[in-house]
Amino acid sequence: MTEYAWHKEIKGWGVATEISLGNRRADCQLRCGKRAEVQARPLPPDEVAGREAHADLWLLDCRAAHRSRRLMVWSDPQFGTLFRWERAWQGFAISKRPVFLNLELDLRTGHGTFLEVTGWTFDGYRATGTGQIHTAASLRSWMRYGLPLAGHQPVAL
């Protein structure tokens, strides 16, 4: 099976790929030393928990959900950036690591948008929550060069 183009692109933003950790591996390592899992499909809760034993954050491909309006993001003057994700990937309800949702990405130009989830709640197949928007360029610079994300607090381990 060939590697999915989105997966290959995103993990290439790190400083190293396919980081071996015992009998598991992380998709990429960031300049700051954190390890990221790059995921293009839903996972069951036990798989999410298992991968979190060796990964520090998640990058999820939510472009199709955003295009089809199953993942809606909007700005609220009182609460900031909010989102609702219909038919959300339920396995991630147990995630304890930071999550970034890829909303848009043009693989030819590198332009795109990510939502850093700052809090979420799952109710069946619906997830609602808060987040912070980042451009693909700023996320890539954070991953590869360690440049801080605008308004970003360091990801705790």
Task: Show where each model-derived region lies.
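Short beta-strand-initiation
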Residues: 23-25, 96
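Short, low-complexity, polar/charged sequence segments that are solvent-exposed and flexible
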Residues: 36, 54-57, 77-80
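Non-catalytic C-terminal interaction segments of nucleic acid-processing enzymes
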Residues: 63-157
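Acidic-basic catalytic patches of nuclease active cores, encompassing PD-(D/E)XK
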Residues: 1-23, 30
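Short histidine-centered beta-strand/loop micro-motifs
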Residues: 18, 47, 116
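Hydrophobic beta-strand segments of well-ordered beta-sheets in folded domains
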Residues: 33-35, 56-61, 98-99
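Mg2+/Mn2+-dependent nuclease catalytic core
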Residues: 42-72
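Conserved catalytic cores of phosphodiester-cleaving nucleases, focusing on short active-site segments
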Residues: 28-44, 55
